[in-house]
Design a protein with these regions (language model features):
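Short hydrophobic beta/alpha edge segments that flank linear recognition/processing sites
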Residues: 82, 110-111, 146-156
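Histidine-centered divalent metal-coordination motifs
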Residues: 77-79, 129, 162-166
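OB-fold (S1/OB) nucleic-acid-binding surfaces
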Residues: 113-122
Length: 195
């Protein structure tokens, strides 16, 4: 029950009492108890985030077969290249467990995360061309959606600072990350919507 409202001068009209008891409209995402204090409400669930801040990048190479700008070979480009300033923060697209942090001459330093959505769907995300000293997670770490995990680099087979971003399905097969993000209604950090 709502507490009794009392006007500063001690009087309260029927009209003002009705306004005092009117439901409150919440425009953001609530957590914990509902506005009435009695029922639980669902917090933002299954929100997928773009890995770089809005307006910070340009997609310079899509998910496709292409001639590698480094090797000159025809290769499957299993992600998208997001050109961005060096050291732009990279965030986890969804909560999960870090399954790999490594470095090689082709990918530079990279992070791969395994995610399990609330419906049980498993997917993996990978973030390449970083510098090892900028990576903020290690294998086995649990990360939250939107958590900073590293920074844009120019390491490995790279012609300029960018994030090579991949999404893999439950069988670890690469899928088009741009289409996948759009299908899963990805938002930028700070643009969450209640569902």
């Amino acid at each position: 029950a709502l507490p009794q409202a009392t006007a500063l001068d001690g009087t309260l009209t029927a009209n003002s009492r009705a306004k005092a008891k009117a439901p409150v409209s919440i425009t953001g995402c609530a957590s914990g108890n509902g506005a009435d204090g009695n029922r639980n409400v669902r917090v933002v669930a299954d929100t997928i985030y773009w890995p770089l801040p809005e307006g910070s990048y340009t997609i310079t190479s899509p998910f496709t077969m292409r001639i590698s700008p480094v090797s000159g070979q025809l290769l499957a480009h299993e992600g998208i290249d997001m050109a961005a300033p060096l050291d732009t923060p990279i965030t986890a697209v969804y909560g999960g467990v870090v399954e790999e942090v490594a470095e090689n001459s082709r990918s530079g330093a990279y992070v791969q995360i395994k995610h399990t959505k609330s419906d049980g769907t498993v997917f993996h995300s990978a973030y390449l061309h970083q510098y090892m000293n900028k990576i903020k997670v290690k294998v086995g770490d649990t990360v939250t959606a939107g958590q900073v995990i590293g920074a844009v680099g120019n390491n490995g087979w790279s012609t300029g600072p960018h994030l090579h971003f991949e999404i893999h399905d439950s069988s670890d097969t690469p899928v088009d990350p741009e289409a996948w993000m759009e299908t899963n209604k990805a938002v930028y950090l700070g643009q969450e919507s209640c569902s």
